[in-house]
C-alpha cells in the first residue's frame, strides 16, 4: 500500500532500522529518527551526518522476505523538543516502560498535522496511557494503535565482524559493550507468525490499520485486529515469559554477581532457571493476568496456544494438540507439566538442520546479561529485567487500585527488590544510576486507571 505520511520513529535501536526499511518499502514517506543523547547516540548522529543511510540484512528464516536493504534517514534528532513540524505519524520504538517519559517531553502543540501514534511493542495498559496523554494535550482525534509485540528478532551487527553468525545470543546485546556495535547496521533472523493490533475505536479498517497490515504482510505475518487496545496488548509475550525466568533466584544471582559463571535465560537448571517451581510461577502469573484482564473487561488468553501457535511451535510428539486446545481446562499440575515439556522441547530448535555431529541449533543459549557500569562508573541494570520489572510493577499497582490480587506478581517483585537492595547496599547508592533507585510506575498506573474508568 502506497503511504507517504511523514513518519518520526522515536527510538533508534535495531527494531527501528527494520521498521524504517519496511516503511520505505511501502512508500516514499519522509523518515525521521529520534534517539536520546548517549554514547551510542552520538556515534549514530555523527555517522548519519556524513552518510544518512541505515543498513539491514536478513539471515536464517528471515532471508525469505528480508534481503540486504538500506534506507535513507531524512532527519535525526536527539532532543524531543525538536519533534516539531509536519510529522503526521509517530512510532514508539522504545521500550514500553519508556513511553511515559518520552511522551511527556513531546511538544504536542507543535505537531498540528499529527494523525497517529503507533506503539511498536506495547504492554498491557500502554494504549490507555498514551490515549490519556494525548487527550490532555488536546489531541483526541489522533489514532492510537497498539501492536502486541515487535514483529521480528533484530540485532545490531557488531563492529569486530561482518559475519552475523558470530553475534552472540545476548538478550541485551551491545548494552555493556557499546563500542562493539554498529548502530547503523542490523540484521533480522526471524519474523513473528502473528501480531495482534487495535486502535482506540476498534476500527480495523482505518487507513493506518490497513497500512500496518500491508507492512507486516511483506514478511508473511498474519495481523489479527482486536476490538480495543487492551485486547491486543494482552498478547504481549514478554509480560508472561520474562518475569518468572528473569526474576528467578538463579537468574538474579547471575544478574547481580557478574563475576560468577554465566546463566542462560531459557535453559533448565543448573545452566538456567527453568525448573518445576519456575514453571509454576509462569502459570501463576498467567492466572494473575487472567484476574486483572477480567476486571478490565477483557478475556484472558490460552497461554499454551499463544506460546505455541503464535510464537514458537514444538513437535506434537512433545506437546499434544489436546494439551494446547484444552489448556485452560486442564488441572493446574497438568498445565504446569505441559508448560515444562514445552520449554524442554525448545532447548534446541527442533526444526533446525542438525550439524555433522547430529546437534540441533542451541535455541536456548540466550545469555543472562549482568549489571554493568557506564563511563561515569555508575551501575546500571540491563533492559532485561529492568523493563520487565517496571511493566510488572505498573500492572501490580493497577491491580491494587482495582481490588485485584496478583500474588505471583507480588512475590516475584519482592524477590527482585530484595536482591536489588542487597546489591545497592554492597556497591553504595552513590555509585548507582538513578534508574536503580526509583521509577514512575505509580504515575503510569494511575493514568491507566483514570483512562479506563473514563471509558467504562
UniProtKB/Swiss-Prot annotation:
InterPro entries listed in its UniProt record: NAD(P)-bd_dom_sf, Opine_metallophore_DH
Ranges in a coiled coil: none
EC number: 1.5.1.-
GO MF: oxidoreductase activity
Active site: 242 (proton donor/acceptor)
Claim: Oxidoreductase is one of the keywords in the record: yes
UniProt keyword list: NADP, Oxidoreductase
A Pfam entry, by short name: Staph_opine_DH
Residues engaged in binding NADP(+): 12-15, 35-40, 154
Reaction catalysed by this enzyme: yersinopine + NADP(+) + H2O = (2S)-2-amino-4-{[(1S)-1-carboxy-2-(1H-imidazol-4-yl)ethyl]amino}butanoate + pyruvate + NADPH + H(+)
Family, per entry: Belongs to the staphylopine dehydrogenase family.
Biological role stated in the UniProt entry: Catalyzes the NADPH-dependent reductive condensation of pyruvate to the intermediate formed by the adjacently encoded enzyme y2836, namely (2S)-2-amino-4-{[(1S)-1-carboxy-2-(1H-imidazol-4-yl)ethyl]amino}butanoate, leading to the production of yersinopine. This is the last step in the biosynthesis of the metallophore yersinopine, which is involved in metal acquisition and thus enables bacterial growth inside the host, where metal access is limited. Therefore, this enzyme probably contributes to Yersinia virulence.
Subunit structure: Homodimer.
Protein name per Swiss-Prot or TrEMBL: Yersinopine synthase
Organism: Yersinia pestis
Taxonomic path: Bacteria, Pseudomonadati, Pseudomonadota, Gammaproteobacteria, Enterobacterales
Amino acid at each position: 500500500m502506497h503511504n507517504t505520511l511523514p513518519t518520526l520513529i522515536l527510538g533508534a535501536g535495531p527494531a527501528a532500522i527494520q521498521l524504517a526499511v519496511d516503511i520505505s518499502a511501502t512508500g516514499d514517506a519522509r523518515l525521521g529518527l529520534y534517539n536520546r543523547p548517549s554514547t551510542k547516540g552520538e556515534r549514530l548522529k555523527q555517522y548519519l551526518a556524513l552518510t544518512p543511510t541505515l543498513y539491514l540484512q536478513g539471515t536464517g528464516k528471515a532471508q525469505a522476505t528480508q534481503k540486504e536493504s538500506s534506507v535513507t534517514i531524512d532527519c535525526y534528532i536527539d532532543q524531543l523538543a525538536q519533534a516539531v513540524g509536519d510529522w503526521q505519524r509517530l512510532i514508539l520504538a522504545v521500550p514500553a516502560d519508556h513511553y511515559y517519559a518520552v511522551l511527556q517531553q513531546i511538544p504536542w502543540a507543535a505537531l498540528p498535522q499529527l494523525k497517529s501514534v503507533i506503539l511498536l511493542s506495547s504492554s498491557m495498559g500502554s494504549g490507555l496511557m498514551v490515549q490519556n496523554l494525548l487527550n490532555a494535550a488536546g489531541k483526541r482525534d489522533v489514532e492510537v494503535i497498539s501492536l502486541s509485540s515487535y514483529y521480528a528478532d533484530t540485532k545490531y551487527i557488531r563492529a569486530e565482524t561482518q559475519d552475523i553468525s558470530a553475534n552472540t545470543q545476548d538478550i541485551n546485546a551491545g548494552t555493556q559493550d557499546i563500542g562493539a556495535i554498529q548502530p547503523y547496521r542490523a540484521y533480522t533472523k526471524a519474523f513473528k507468525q502473528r501480531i495482534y493490533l487495535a486502535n482506540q475505536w476498534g476500527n480495523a479498517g482505518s487507513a493506518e490499520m490497513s497500512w500496518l497490515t500491508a507492512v507486516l504482510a511483506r514478511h508473511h505475518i498474519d495481523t489479527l485486529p482486536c476490538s480495543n487496545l487492551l485486547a491486543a496488548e494482552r498478547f504481549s509475550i514478554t509480560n508472561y515469559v520474562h518475569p518468572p525466568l528473569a526474576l528467578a533466584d538463579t537468574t538474579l544471582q547471575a544478574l547481580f554477581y557478574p563475576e560468577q559463571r554465566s546463566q542462560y535465560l531459557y535453559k533448565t537448571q543448573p545452566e538456567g532457571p527453568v525448573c518445576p517451581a519456575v514453571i509454576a510461577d509462569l502459570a501463576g502469573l498467567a492466572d494473575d493476568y487472567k484476574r486483572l484482564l477480567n476486571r478490565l473487561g477483557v478475556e484472558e488468553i490460552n497461554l499454551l496456544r499463544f506460546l505455541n501457535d503464535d510464537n514458537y511451535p514444538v513437535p506434537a510428539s512433545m506437546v499434544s494438540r489436546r494439551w494446547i486446545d484444552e489448556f485452560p481446562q486442564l488441572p493446574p499440575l497438568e498445565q504446569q507439566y505441559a508448560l515444562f515439556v514445552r520449554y524442554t522441547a525448545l532447548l534446541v530448535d527442533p526444526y533446525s538442520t542438525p550439524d555433522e555431529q547430529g546437534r540441533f541449533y542451541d535455541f536456548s543459549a540466550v545469555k543472562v546479561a549482568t549489571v554493568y557500569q557506564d563511563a561515569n562508573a555508575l551501575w546500571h541494570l540491563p533492559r532485561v529485567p529492568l523493563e520487565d520489572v517496571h511493566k510488572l510493577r505498573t500492572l501490580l499497582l493497577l491491580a491494587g487500585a482495582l481490588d485485584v490480587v496478583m500474588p505471583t506478581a507480588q512475590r516475584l517483585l519482592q524477590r527482585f527488590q530484595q536482591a536489588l537492595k542487597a546489591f545497592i547496599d554492597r556497591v553504595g547508592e552513590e555509585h548507582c544510576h538513578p534508574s536503580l533507585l526509583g521509577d514512575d510506575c505509580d504515575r503510569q498506573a494511575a493514568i491507566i486507571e483514570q483512562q479506563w474508568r473514563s471509558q467504562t
